[in-house]
Design a protein with these regions (language model features):
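Basic helix-turn-helix/winged-helix DNA-binding cores
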Residues: 1-65
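Short, charged amphipathic alpha-helical surface segments
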Residues: 51, 56, 61-114
Length: 117
């Protein structure tokens, strides 16, 4: 399977597929005559897993550890859930603060600076 076909099948851009190869997340074979990448079922399976983990905002280093069997999947998912909860709390605080600024009806940047410093 070509990189174009792999991209269509997985929903991952060709650029990202090449990057994942460079990072050592996938290992496509190469055609002898033209050095084109060839993706097999295992490459596609790994790409789909990478796609799923990236949707969870998981770092590539952690994904690699999971795919290589160096990190337990359930443990990684629990850690990621905690990371997402922390991000959610920070975003909620930022949204709340944004609303507070709007409610004060401050229109001048100097006023905002004095009011919240």
């Amino acid at each position: 399977m070509t990189i174009k076909e792999a991209a269509l099948l997985t929903g991952i851009t060709r650029q990202n597929i090449r990057y994942y190869e460079k990072m050592g997340l996938i290992y496509p074979s190469r055609e002898k005559e033209n050095q084109y990448r060839k993706y097999n079922k295992e490459d596609i399976r790994r790409l789909k897993l990478i796609y799923m983990f990236r949707k969870l905002d998981m770092p590539l280093e952690e994904i690699q550890q999971i795919l290589d069997g160096r990190k337990d999947l359930q443990e990684a998912l629990e850690q990621q859930k905690e990371q997402l909860r922390q991000k959610q709390q920070k975003l909620a605080a930022a949204l709340s603060f944004c609303g507070e600024i709007q409610e004060t009806e401050l229109t001048d940047l100097n006023e905002i600076g004095r009011a919240h410093v």
